Design a protein with these regions (language model features):
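C-terminal non-catalytic regions of proteins with extracellular/luminal or membrane-system context
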Residues: 1-405
Length: 405
């Protein structure tokens, strides 16, 4: 079924406005001519009226053709031409390119000898994100639902690993879905108290190796919350808040902290997989000697999780480098303290029409880059050189950092 967006309809009408005015003028002139000949004698009256009607019809047809050949040309062509399909060969090539990009882009942040898992085939995968991973961002970074996706768990299984089905069932049956980006910032995660003693004991018998998954969304259209208490989200438990006032989206929720505590108390060898589209405060890993490996798999697309499995198994040697700087405390950065939606004065004349479904009522805004040319890694390198910061206490993983096997 075709769905109409009123803003699109209004836009099309505005494009056709001069032509529609011409049609209206033609109709008015024709009607006036037909009325004016009312007092004429019958044969002459019929002739004038007939010619007036003929002229009206001809004029409307000409203008309608001008509309079709002019402002409506592209729209009519796209809506009437035969639908083109993507060939199986093109789809498979695209999937293979996605695997290659993920294989070359996944970053090995830490490795205390745990990776690759050459002799380990059984893995306990913890975290709700394991069954609801982040595949991509928003806008141009979003995915097409017409094509199948390789899930994180499928990628691990395709690499030859056997996964703990009890954990998978726990997360699948948790009964929550990932909220729409920008409207709800909930981070579903099973509370630690919902892991039964029997489930944990079975997991320990299954394997002494665990993967913990953490995921964060991001993309155009919505800034990530700098204070979770000021946005809409749902706590995972009635006994505590996932975030206190002032805590932000790019740090662990309380439920995630509890899960990591639970895993590290029960398993000797832990790998953290961060499936996120922005850098994250990962300083907590230094409190857990059990976390021996960290991988940053940033939105791997339709089939990229195949490569994650191959990296963990050792079939692929990770070679990705960080595209941004990982910091211990994001709140102490120039970016954090200076980004925003700052409005210029006297910009009402440039205000976007309220009918626009995406940015209706918006006016041009700006960001004040107070650090000048020292944006990103340049700031930390320069500030450390000048003695303004302690680099090692500020930067956890620098821009361009990444390990390999």
């Amino acid at each position: 079924m075709i769905k109409l967006n009123m803003s699109d309809v209004i836009s099309v009408l505005n494009m056709c406005k001069p032509y529609l005015i011409a049609i209206a003028v033609i109709l008015v002139v024709g009607i006036v001519a037909a009325v004016m000949c009312k007092k004429m004698e019958n044969p002459k009256r019929k002739l004038v009226r007939g010619n007036a009607i003929l002229a009206m019809v001809l004029g409307v047809v000409i203008v309608a053709n001008l509309i079709c050949a002019g402002p409506m040309s592209t729209l009519l062509t796209l809506s009437t031409q035969a639908a083109e399909t993507v060939s199986d060969e093109t789809t498979e090539q695209s999937n293979e390119d996605c695997r290659t990009i993920a294989a070359e882009g996944t970053v090995l942040l830490e490795n205390d000898g745990i990776l690759p898992l050459k002799d380990t085939k059984n893995i306990n995968v913890f975290g709700w994100a394991s069954v609801n991973p982040i595949y991509g961002g928003s806008g141009a970074g979003a995915l097409n639902d017409l094509y199948d996706r390789v899930t994180m768990l499928e990628g691990l299984e395709d690499a030859g690993f056997k996964l703990n089905g009890e954990l998978t069932d726990l997360y699948t049956n948790y009964g929550k879905e990932r909220a729409d980006y920008g409207s709800d910032w909930s981070l579903p995660e099973v509370p630690a108290e919902d892991y039964s003693d029997e489930l944990i004991e079975n997991a320990k018998e299954f394997s002494d190796t665990a993967i913990v998954t953490i995921a964060r969304w991001g993309g155009e259209g919505s800034d990530l919350p700098t204070d979770m208490s000021s946005v809409s989200y749902t706590n995972n438990s009635d006994s505590y808040n996932d975030f206190e006032t002032g805590q932000h989206y790019l740090e662990l929720s309380q439920t995630e902290k509890n899960m990591i505590n639970l895993v590290c108390e029960n398993f000797e060898h832990v790998i953290l997989v961060y499936d996120g589209l922005s850098t994250f405060e990962l300083g907590f890993v230094e409190d857990y000697p059990q976390i021996e490996g960290i991988l940053w798999c940033a939105g791997p697309g339709q089939t990229g999780f195949d490569s994650l499995g191959k990296i963990i198994s050792g079939e692929v040697n990770p070679s990705g480098k960080t595209s941004d700087t990982f910091l211990y405390d994001l709140t102490e950065t120039p970016t954090w303290n200076n980004f925003g939606d700052f409005k210029y004065d006297n910009m009402e004349e440039f205000k976007i029409d309220e009918s626009d479904p995406y940015v209706g009522g918006s006016v041009p805004t700006f960001v004040n880059y107070v650090e000048g040319i020292y944006v990103g890694y340049r700031f930390y390198e320069t500030a450390a050189q000048e003695g303004a910061i302690d680099y090692d206490k500020t930067v956890q993983y620098p821009f361009g950092y990444g390990l390999s096997y």
